[in-house]
Amino acid sequence: MAKLDTITLSVLQAALQQVCDEMDLTFSRAAFSPVIAEANDRSDGIYSALDGSLIAQGSQGLPVFVGVMQYSTKTVIEMIADGRCLPPEPGDIYIVNDPYLGGTHLMDVRFAMPVYRGEKIFCWLSNTGHWPDIGGSVPGGFSASATAVEQEGLRLPPVKLFKKGVLDPEIYAIICSNIRVADQRIGDIRAQAAALLIGQDRLNGILDRYGDETVVEAIAELRRRAAEQMRANIAAIPDGTYHSKAFVDSDGVVNEPLTIALAVEKQGDTLTFDFTGSSRPCAGPMNSVLATTLSSVYLAMRHIFPDVPISAGAFEPLIVKRPEGTFLDAKYPRPVSGCAAEVSQRIAEAVFAAMVQALPDKVTAAPAGSSGNFALGGNDPARGRDYVMYQISGGGYGGNSGHDGLTNGCSTIGISKSPPVEIMEQAFPVLYRHYALREGSGGAGKHRGGFGLAYEVEILRGDARASFVMDHGRFGPQGALGGKDGEPNSVTVFRGGVEHVPPHLSKEQDIPLKAGDRVRVGTPGGGGYGDPLERDANLVLRDVALGYYTSEEASEKFGVVLSAGGLTIDRKATDRQRAG
């Protein structure tokens, strides 16, 4: 075999990513549920046949899933090896959602399929899709007051859902007997399997063209280069230990904050992440399983060094000490529905807060840091059927050294977007009375945070139950280097004309609603970066003109005094205000 040349290596790198991209798009375009088809709450990747380590991921999937899936794939491989799982055959697809076996929360359902070359497994393809319901005590699975994982839904160890390409009717029946709106899941299941089959076909085309040995050599070289590049980036960071803290509002059961304490030690070309001092395992659903904790650290560093190609090699210089005895290393039966969408973002926030001290030009202030999980389940009398609606929302990104934060961006753990209002109103008996930018929510700074989202949903028909598992309701996203925090999450429910604010601010379950009742949500703005008094006064004037801040906020937050109805800057008054 000829030595692998640079051009072939580059072509194969792009080809492997393209396989994953096509799997992502197939999954979304064929899926039934809006959360997958419209919001893209899914991901696909290619994983090592030896240990499940990440080979490639698509650019269209949730990055946190791809990092996690290397652990769930590894678990499938290990359970097959020790006889706890039936051995694979061509065409088999395993299903698993057990959080403690390399997962996230129960709603994130993983499929894993071996790709054979002859009689040997060449690699594994795996994907994750967020199912709108997985059973449990409340529609949507976000049980804010759950104290055990069984209350959150059906937990599946790795089992064959497809055998030699055929859906197993018995396993399918067990699943359907334990979830809501089960008749709608077959569309998502078929889409999830189809994505893997497309990936298998495209990967076999690459292997047939270039040869198995060449592709294996390319995979090894890409992993080596990713590790080398990450090490080079780390080596440029000043040696030392950087400390930070981030806070979870509450666990949904005990109304007290949870602390993420982080020390990042940089030595040579490695970073060591130590969460010693973080809160102990909690009673409610804001525990994080180890796979999610690890993936959250990796993803945060991916934000800081986006130039590093993503593969298992990129993670090698990142050493995460296992946070045993804390809520970041959940063990059965701790509930975990808040881990993937909320706690993972607090972990990333802690990483950002530590690393901005070392790399102020590369790291932003804290982003919104909440996926805005809002689940609504009920019966639509006009259609004569039950439904489960799942709404996720964007928020403001943190400001950085050169720019203001992005407004209404997706969460930092992925690329999920809010489903279009028109799709939600068509699919469910709801009306969006208001859907707009949340003015004033961005944290003040030399570069302000981006703004969150404000929306209000009215129930049009029938009875329903609402549940929320969000975060940043008590603490807004942190500012950096003198910047101010962004505005926190806000949830208000109007029942029979009476206003109700959840005691845990961003978490509650099973709130009964009737036609005419409304839910109002305001998502967080991003943290500000740098001293607000150093912000260009002309930018403050522009923000006021656009309606982002009031004239009063311009003076209070930025020290900019406006005159003539907010149309011009009073330079002398501004100088006095900023001088204190």
Model-predicted segments: where are they?
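Glycine/proline-enriched, intrinsically flexible loops and inter-domain linkers
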Residues: 1-90, 98-117, 121-580
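Glycine-rich phosphate-binding loop of nucleotide-binding enzymes
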Residues: 93
